Amino acid sequence: MDQPAGGTGKLRASAGEDDSMELSTCQELLHRLRELEAENSALAQANENQRETYERCLDEVANHVVQALLNQKDLREECIKLKKRVFDLERQNQVLSALLQQKLQLTANSLPQIPLTPLQPPSERPTSPAPNVSEGPATSLPSGLCAGQREVCWEQQLRPGGPGPPATPPPALDALSPFLRKKAQILEVLRALEETDPLLLCSPATPWRPTGQGPGSPEPINGEPCGPPQPEPSPWAPYLLLGPGSLGALLHWERVLGGPGEEEGIRQPWASSRAPPSAQGPSSGPHCAPGSSSSSSSDEAGDPNEAPSPDTLLGALARKQLNLGQLLGDTETYLQAFLAGATGPLSGDQPGPGKPNSPDPGPPQVSKSKGLPKSAWGASTPEATRLGFGATSEGQGPLPFLSMFMGAGDAPLGSRPGHPHSSSQVKSKLQIGPPSPGDAQGPLLPSPARGLKFLKLPPASEKVPSPGGPQLSPQLPRSSRIPCRNSGSDGSPSPLLARRGLGGGELSPEGAQGLPGSPLPCSAMPDSAQLRPSQSTVSTALSPGPVVSPCFENILDLSRSTFRGSPPEPPPSPLQVPTYPQLTLEVPQTPEVLRSPGAPSPGLPESCPYSGPQEKSMDRAGSESPHASRRTPGGSSKKPGQGSGRRPGDPSHTPLRDRLAALGKLKTGPEGPLGPEKNGVPARSSAEKARALVRSGECAGDVPPSARPLEQPEAKGIFRGAVALGTSSLKQQEPGLTDPGARVYSSHSMGARVDLEPISPRSCLTKVELAKSRLAGALCPQMPRTPAKVPTSAPSLGKPKSPHSSPTKLPSKSPTKVVPRPVVPLGTKEPPKPDKVKGPPWADCGSTVGQPTSPVAGPADPSQGSEGPAPHSAIEEKVMKGIEENVLRLQGQERTPGSEAKHRNTSSIASWFGLKKSKLPALNRRTEATKNKDGAGGGSPLRKEVKTEARKLEAESLNISKLMAKAEDLRRALEEEKAYLSRARPRPGGPATVPSPGLGQAQGQLAGMYQGADTFMQQLLNRVDGKELPPKSWREPKPEYGDFQPVSTDPKSPWPACGPRNGLVGPLQGCGKPGKPSSEPGRREEMPSEDSLAEPVSTTHFTACGSLTRTLDSGIGTFPPPDHSSSGTPSKNLPKTKSLRLDPPPGAPPARPPGLTKVPRRAHTLEREVPGIEELLVSGRHPSMPAFPGLLTAPPGHRSHQTCPDDPCEDPGPPPPVQLAKNWTFPNTRTAGSSSDPFLCPPRQLEGLPRTPMALPVDRKQSVDPSRTSTPQGPAFGGSRTPSTSDMGEEGRVASGGAPGLETSESLSDSLYDSLSSCGSQG
C-alpha cells in the first residue's frame, strides 16, 4: 500500500503537469492495489486453508487419541467385568465346595463304616501293588485315599454296581448323596470326553511316565519326608498328577498298573495333600515305590488302559473296597477339590498337560472339571489349606499334585536325570514358588485349551485361596489371559505342552503361580512372581539346583543338544533352573523345551516323550516355539544359563505379559516388583507391556530376564552373559543362519533383553520391548502375528540382507539385541558387517547388533519386529492401522508433498500425535514396520509411493511446515516452561553426569539417564536462553568423532560405534568401545576420552529418557517438526526425512533403538525441535532453526560435510567435539548437526551399508541422525538428541540417501515412541 501512497503523491505532483499522467498513474496504482488485494486474499485463503488443514490434523489426532482412550477404557471395563465375574465364580465355587464338604462330612459321618476296609481291599485289589498298597497306602490311604477313594467313590457312583467290594462303597456313595452321584456322572462324562480329547490322547502317557520316573520328585513333595521313596513316588507323580486332578485316571492307571498301591499312591498323594504331613511320608514312600514301576508301566500302557480305566478303576476301587468312610472323606476332599477346581484342575490339568493326559485323557478332563471345583475347593477353607496356600506344609499335600504335576513335568525333569531329590526339590521349589501355583502349574501343563480354561479358573480359585487382592490380580491376568491366550493361545494350540506351558501353563502358572506366589508372599501378583522365582531359585539353587539344573539343563540341553548339544551346560542350568523356577511357567516350558528338542533326550527320559509332542508343538509353534527352544540353545552355547534364562524369559514372557496386560494395576503394582527385578526396567517395560497386550510377550521376555538377573546373582554376569550370549548368538547365527540364525536371533533377543534390562532401564525398555516383541512373536506372539512373524523370521534371514527397508526394520529388532551383542558382536559384527552390506541400513537401526546378527538376527528380528507391532492386541493393531491410514490420508490430502507427506506420514504426523508421545503413533509406525516387514519390499514401495505423493504435495507440505512451525513455537513455549521447571535439576546433572553413564554403564546410565535428562533439559534451556557455547563445544567434539568415524568406517568399527548405541546401555556401550578399538582403537579411545561416545551415548540415552518424558509432556509438541519443514530447505529435507521415516517403518523395530536415540533428539529438540525428529531433521537441514541458531550455524558447515558423507572433512567440524565431550550428553543432542555429527555415524552407515557409525565425520554427521538413531544408539542418543544433531542427521540422511535417512527417521520415530513409552512407564 506504500506504493499506492507514493503513487498517489506522484499523481498529485503530476496532476499539475499532466492529468493524463495522473490518470495513468492512478490506474496503475489501482491495478496494483487490485493485484495486492488479490494476492492478499489469496494468501489469506491459503492461510485459512492451511489453518483448516492443520486443525483437521489436530482433530484427527485428537480423534485417534480419543478412540484409543475409549478402546482402552472399554478394554479396561471388560477386564474389570471379567475379573468380577471370575471373582463371583470363585466365590460360588467356594460356597459350593463348602456345601459339598458339609454334605460329604455328613455322608462320611453316616458312612464311616468303611474307613479302613477299603484300604485293605485296595491292597488286595491290586495284586501286584497290593503289598505296596498295604505298605504305604494303608498308612497314607486313610488320608491319602481321599483322592483315590474319592475317585473310587465317583467311580462307584458312576458304576455303583462295579466290583463287588465297591458295591458297598457305591451304596455308601449313593448314601453319600445324589450330589456325589451327579458329580461322579459328570466326572465320568468328562473322563470320556477327555479320553477322546485329541490333545490328551496326543500327549503320550510316556512323557508322563518319565514324569512318573521323576515321580520320585512327587514323592519328595508328597512325602518329602520320604527321601528314599522319592523314586517310588516319582511314578506316583503322574498318578498324583492324575490322582489329584483326575483320580479316575489315576485309578485306571493304578488298576492298569495293578496299582492298588498306585491307586493308593495317588490317594496317598492326595492324602498327602489332604493330610500332607501324616499321609505324605508313609503314603508317598511305600505307595510311591510300587507306583514307581507301576506308574511307568501304566504310563506306558496308560493310553491303552485309559479306555478301560473307568471300569478298571471302578473294579480296582471295588477290589480295594476303599473304606467307605475314607472314600467319603476322600470323596469329600476330592469333591471339595473338584468344586474348588484348584486341586482338581491342578492335578487333572497337570496330568492332562503332562503326558498323563493322553494315558489319562479322561481323568485329566475330570480333573479339569474337577479342576475348577478343586480350585474352588482350594478356595474353600479345607481345600484352600490343602492347596497349599496355607500349604507350605500342605504344599506337600496339594503340592504333591502340584509337585506331581511339577514333579512330573518339572521335578521329573530332575528326576529323570535320576535326581529324585532334585525333582522333589523342583517340586519343592515349585511348591515354594507356587505351592498353590504348583496346582496352577499343573493346569499349565495340561491341555492348552482346557488348561487355559481351567487354568484361568484354577488360578482364580488359587487366587481365591489367596487374599482377595491376589485373587483379583490373578484374575486380571486371567482376563488378560484371554488376550494373552491369543498370544499364549499359540502356546495352547501349537504344542500341547509347549503351548500349554506357554499359553496355558505360562498364563496359568504365571497367574496361578503368581497367585500362589501371592498367597505365599501375600503380595501383589508381581511380588508373588518375584517371590516365586526366588523361591524357585532357592529351591533349585539348593538341592535341586544341580538336579534341577540337569532337569532344566536337560530341557535346555534338549533344545541345545539339538542345536548345541549342551548337556554339559547343566551346571549353568542351575541358573537356568532358577530362572525357570523363577518363572514357574518356565518349568512347564522346560518340558516344552525337552519335548521340543525331542531328539535330545540326554538324561531326560520324559524329555523324549515330551519331545515327541513338544516337538510337534514346537513345529506347531512354527518358528516361534523352535525359536524359543533354539533361542535357548543359541544363548546356551556361551551361556547355558543365559540361554536357559532366555527360554525362561520367553515362558515368563507370556505370564508376565498377561499379568501386565491383564493387570493394568500390574503396570503399577507389578512394575514395582518387576522394577526391582529389572533395575526398574521391568516397571517401565511392564507398563509398556500392559500398554500393548500383544507386547505382553515382550514384557514377559523383559521381565524374565529381569527376574533372571534378580534370581541369578550374576546380574553383571548376565550382562556379560547377555553380551556373551549376544556373541554366542551372533556366532550361532553366523554358523547356522537359517534355523540357528532364527534361534540365535531369538536367543539374542533374550540376550539383548537380559542385557538391556540390567543395563539401562529406559534403553532396556525400548530394547526389551523389541526383545519382548520378538520373544512374544517367537515364543508366543499373539496368534496370527506369531505365524506371520515366524514366517518373517524365516524370510527375514534373507530380508534383512536384501531390502534396506527390511534391514532397517530388522535393526529395530536387532537394536534390541544390539545392546547384548555389542561387546562380542563387535568382533563378530565386523565379519558380519561385510556380509551385511545391506545390514548397515538395518544396522543403522541396530547397527551394533545388526551386523553380526544381521543375517540371522535380521530374519529373527523381522519376525520380532513384526511381532513387536504384532504383539499389540488386535484392537491395538487395528487402531494403529487406522491411525496410520488416517495419517496417510491426511498426508495425502494435506501434505501431499510427497516426501514430506511420507515423512510426516511416518514421522511428522506420527511424531505430532503418535511419534512423539502418542502410543498410537508409535503403534502406527510399528504397524507400518510390520507391514513393511510383512511385505519384504512393501516398505520400499510404500516409501516410493509416499515420496511420489510427497513431491506432488511438496508445496502443501511447505505450507503445513509453516503451520507446524507455528505449532512448534507453541510447543517450544510449553517445552521451555517445562525446561525451566526442570532446569534446576538438569543443570546440576549436566556434564558431570555424562562421564558417569559412559563409565558406570549400567548404573551410570541409570544415573546418567536421570542426570543426563536434567543436563539435557539444562542444555536445552541454555539453548533457549541463547547460550550457544554448548553447541560449539559439541561441534568441537564432533571433529574427533568425525575422525573417529572415518576410522570406524574402514574397519566397520562403526558397528563398534554401534557399541555406543549399545552404549545406550552402559555396559554395551563399554563393549562397543572395546569392539571399536580393534578397528579404530585410537578413535575409539578418543571417543572414550571425550566420553563422547560411551559417555554421551549413555548420558544421552538417559537424557533421551528424561527428554522423552518431557517430550511426552510436551505431547503434541511433536507437531512442530513440520515447523522446521516450514523453511523451503526443511521441507525438502522433510520429504527425505519422511522417506527415511517410511523406511523406518520397516525399521520400525530398529526405530526402537533409535527410539532411544530419537528420544534424545526429541528430548534435545524439546525446546527447539521438540516438534520431533522431522523437525530435528529439518532443522539439521536448515540452520535457521530458531531455537538453536548456534546449533544451526554449526550445522551448516557440518551439513556440507554431511552432504558429503564420504568427506572426512567433517573432521574439521569435529574439532568442536572436544567440548562435545563436555556437553556430549545433551550438547551432542543439541548440536545434532554440528557437534553431534561425530555420533552421527548413521549418515555414512546409511549411505555405506557398512553402517560404520563413526565411518566418517561427515558420515557420522549424516549417520548421526540415522545411525545415531539406529546404529550407535548411545551416540545416536547423544547425537540424535541434539536438535542440531537431528538437523544434521536430516541433512546427513539426505546426503546419505533417502532410504537410510528415512529408515533412520522412522526408526527414530519408533524408537522415540519406545523411549517415550519407557519414560512414560517409568514416570
From Swiss-Prot:
User: Region Mediates interaction with CDK5RAP2 and is required for homodimerization and microtubule bundle formation: what ranges?
Assistant: 1-135
Sorted alphabetically, which InterPro entries does this protein's record hold? NCKAP5_C, Nckap5l
Q: Where is this region: Mediates interaction with beta-tubulin and is required for microtubule bundle formation?
A: 743-1136
Residue ranges with Pro residues bias = 162-172, 226-236, 353-364, 1143-1153
What keywords appear on the UniProt entry? Coiled coil, Cytoplasm, Cytoskeleton, Microtubule, Phosphoprotein
Q: Where is this motif: (S/T)X(I/L)P motif 2?
A: 808-811
Q: Which GO terms describe its cellular component?
A: centrosome; cytoplasm; microtubule plus-end
Positions of short motif (S/T)X(I/L)P motif 3: 918-921
- On whether Coiled coil is a keyword of this UniProt record, the answer is yes
Q: How is it modified after translation?
A: CDK1/Cyclin B-dependent phosphorylation mediates its dissociation from centrosomes during mitosis.
The PTM Phosphoserine maps to: S436, S447, S466, S473, S489, S492, S494, S573, S760, S1184
Give me the stretches of Low complexity compositional bias: 271-298, 799-817, 1302-1323
User: Per the Swiss-Prot or TrEMBL record, what residue ranges does the short sequence motif (S/T)X(I/L)P motif 1 cover?
Assistant: 480-483
State the compartments where it is located: Cytoplasm, Cytoskeleton, Microtubule organizing center, Centrosome
Q: Where is the composition biased (Basic and acidic residues)?
A: 647-660, 925-934, 1027-1041
Swiss-Prot/TrEMBL GO biological process terms: microtubule bundle formation; microtubule depolymerization
Which cysteines share a disulfide bond?
Answer: none
Superkingdom per UniProt = Eukaryota
Residues covered by region (Disordered): 1-22, 113-142, 156-175, 204-238, 260-314, 341-714, 778-875, 892-948, 979-1003, 1027-1323
Coiled-coil positions: 22-109, 942-985
Where is the sequence biased in composition, kind Polar residues? 531-542, 1097-1112, 1124-1136, 1225-1237, 1264-1273
List residues, modification Phosphothreonine: T654
Say what the protein does. Regulates microtubule organization and stabilization. Promotes microtubule growth and bundling formation and stabilizes microtubules by increasing intense acetylation of microtubules. Both tubulin-binding and homodimer formation are required for NCKAP5L-mediated microtubule bundle formation.
How the protein assembles, per its UniProt entry?
A: Homodimer. Interacts with CDK5RAP2. Interacts with MAPRE1. Interacts with beta-tubulin.
The protein's name is Nck-associated protein 5-like
Q: Which gene encodes it?
A: Nckap5l
